[in-house]
Amino acid sequence: VSAQKKTQKTYIPWSNGKLVVSEEGRYLKHENGTPFFWLGETGWLLPERLNRDEAEYYLEQCKRRGYNVIQVQTLNNVPSMNIYGQYSMTDGYNFKNINQKGVYGYWDHMDYIIRTAAKKGLYIGMVCIWGSPVSHGEMNVDQAKAYGKFLAERYKDEPNIIWFIGGDIRGDVKTAEWEALATSIKAIDKNHLMTFHPRGRTTSATWFNNAPWLDFNMFQSGHRRYGQRFGDGDYPIEENTEEDNWRFVERSMAMKPMKPVIDGEPIYDEIPHGLHDENELLWKDYDVRRYAYWSVFAGSFGHTYGHNSCLLYTSDA
């Protein structure tokens, strides 16, 4: 056993080349033709809530369990503060002096997470900034351009980045800001794929399928059970189809041009039906598997998992 461990090597997927979209637009592959099946893990607040040792441990567990993409929020707030008390912005959206000598800053910690993941063969799905602060006016178009330039210049040469524009938000909310962020990154970074993480029960294909910066579509099937409408007046799907995540695959792949599609946020394991009401029943592992089967068999190029104990890294989880 010890000899086997010594010879066992970490699989580095980008040794097959960068991720690209297949010619027919159905799935992702590497430059040498090796197919890539996305098996994502949701670790939204990893950059903020875990220290170096905890982050390394978490990423190692992800590797051992076969995940290959870890989805994180680069910024959850403006500014965000991490476990070391360091802020993501020390001078607004001016990042000129963000690196302070002798200080292990917010972005140093982000660098550490990305490079630790790379050593383990893991991609980081980077939600550049969550949707709520943008919807509240905390990033305008010029600021989005500055932030996108900063991100692209800092991470364009890292091998394991996948860019997420948006963050639990509709694409018709603050569209100009999202477009500015996406295009400013793509103008500098030619090495990494990009998508848009939308609001529950919507798909990025609705707004951005023709956008040249969007390499593949993402939908959020959401966390509601059949008939759990909550009285929403502006409901984006037919009632009593809430659990049918395969419908989003069909809807997305019917668009022209066809782009690969994935459920980037389905129901979370051990989360209440509808997400927030603790008196509700909890989604279980067999529910999670059903979502994965339905999505992948309908034609998605992978799937993302999430568990209540890992999403926000709360001490009492």
Give each language-model segment a name.
Residues 211, 216, 220-224, 230-310:
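Catalytic-core region of carbohydrate-active enzymes that cleave or remodel glycosidic bonds
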Residues 39-50, 90, 295, 299-303, ...:
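Short, charged N-terminal helix-start/capping segments
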Residues 313-317:
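Conserved small/polar residues in nucleotide/adenosyl-binding loops
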Residues 1-7:
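Bacterial Sec-dependent N-terminal signal peptides
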Residues 11-228, 235-244:
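Active-site mouth of glycoside hydrolases
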